[in-house]
Amino acid sequence: MKSRFLLYFLLIPILLSAQPYAVRQLGIEKGLSNNYVVSIAQDKEGFLWFATEEGLNKFDGTRFITYYKNEIRNGYGITGNELNCLLDDPKDSILWIGTQRAGLNAYDYVNDTFTFYRHNEAAPESIITDDVTNIVAADDGNLWVTTYWKGIEYFDKETGHFFHYNTATVPGLASDNIWTVADGGNGKLYIGHVHHGFSILSIKDKKVRNFVHDPNNRNSLPGNEVRCVYKDMNHNIWVGTNKGLALFNPESENFIQFNSDGNLSHYIYD
């Protein structure tokens, strides 16, 4: 789902337009499984998907179809009802689903089948933990999967193997509590921590640079809880924190803060 600060900018042309727009509310009375919606995605067939605290929902423009744990579809079902994130695969007809405590799920919406990836102590190539906070497309077509307790996973879709990037494998990484990442497409991974600021990881050699808020430096990170990181079409890196929005300049390694004029909420998240 696009970050709220991006929606703010996208809504400006709508607000300036004279065209009337109708807003429809879609809640449990319309068939949504739960009103606490944590993530939204649109698939390649045009359907909207809503992840909630109580199941997965597909909306066809008229009605909702719900997907719950223990509902078997062609052999398997979704592994948990408490969800955190969705990603429509950039290449394949797959909806990726991150759960709070039940691993990573892949839903093939053409063939109506689920595949799941859970932590397995006996398999070091399995996902390192079942608590998934975000799923992001990697520059090479694979996936980055962030977790709340065990760092970042790189998922090779062809082999089904996970490669672990955490404080045990990346010396100097600020923490293993990760909200999100963005693939810079330049061999660098931009990382948002739960409490420990912002990091830049050189994927090949695993060198890392960490950035935290400095109250004496107006060009530092606004806040240390980084909920969203976004690379725009001009390769700018936008960072959403608990204390406002910032634009990161990779050349100077400074942040331009957008948190003082009252136009944006200080808490930026996706």
Residue positions per predicted region:
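Carboxylate-rich, polar loop motifs that coordinate divalent cations or form catalytic acidic clusters
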Residues: 1-270
